[in-house]
């Protein structure tokens, strides 16, 4: 698997000041990632990550989207952007393939980042790639809250310098559940 021929090269955008985001590893221990620029080569796992990045207007930065069995499951307003993602599959690509994609950000759930999966955040940080793990993927379903989802969207908004878009998504979600 290679995405070297990925046609669109996203614009380089520096973050001033740099953005530091707290995320969590498998057992819920926090770790921090600092972003000095908006990520340009994103590997996104699972539908929520892919759709949120697209909703923020940053779908052209996704070089691989994994975890969606068929495009029909993608919200209709996001399908055009989803179709442009160079590598799409229900299953994770193997580690070697992901390394060849040269990501600078990987977004997924805690189950993604294990020694048996796509390795730990420390593995990726040693290769100049940040990792963002959704807090909602850490615990039991009964512990999930909308605030966790809103924080997830806010964090991605900060990472991609799309704070206004993130707040609009959150506002729309709040209106739909009110």
Where would I find each of the regions flagged by the language model?
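Extracytoplasmic/secreted cell-surface and envelope-processing proteins
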Residues: 73-74, 114-118, 142
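Bacterial Sec-exported substrate-binding components of ABC uptake systems
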Residues: 1-51, 163-178
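Active-site-adjacent structural elements in enzyme catalytic domains
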Residues: 40, 47, 100-105, 115-126, ...
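Extracellular/periplasmic catalytic domains that process cell-envelope and extracellular macromolecules
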Residues: 13, 35-37, 57, 99-100, ...
């Amino acid at each position: 698997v290679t995405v070297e021929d990925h046609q669109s090269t996203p614009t380089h955008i520096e973050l001033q000041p740099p953005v530091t985001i707290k995320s969590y590893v498998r057992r819920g221990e926090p770790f921090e990632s600092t972003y000095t620029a908006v990520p340009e080569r994103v590997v996104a796992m699972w539908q929520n990550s892919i759709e949120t990045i697209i909703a923020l207007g940053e779908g052209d930065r996704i070089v691989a989207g994994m975890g969606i069995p068929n495009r029909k499951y993608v919200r209709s307003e996001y399908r055009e952007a989803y179709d442009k993602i160079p590598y799409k599959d229900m299953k994770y690509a193997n580690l070697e393939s992901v390394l060849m994609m040269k990501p600078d950000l990987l977004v997924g759930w805690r189950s993604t980042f294990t020694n048996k999966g796509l390795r730990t955040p420390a593995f990726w940080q040693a290769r100049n790639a940040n990792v963002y793990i959704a807090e909602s993927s850490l615990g039991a379903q009964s512990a999930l809250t909308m605030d966790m989802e809103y924080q997830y969207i806010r964090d991605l908004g900060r990472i991609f310098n799309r704070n206004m878009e993130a707040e609009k998504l959150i506002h729309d979600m709040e209106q739909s559940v009110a």
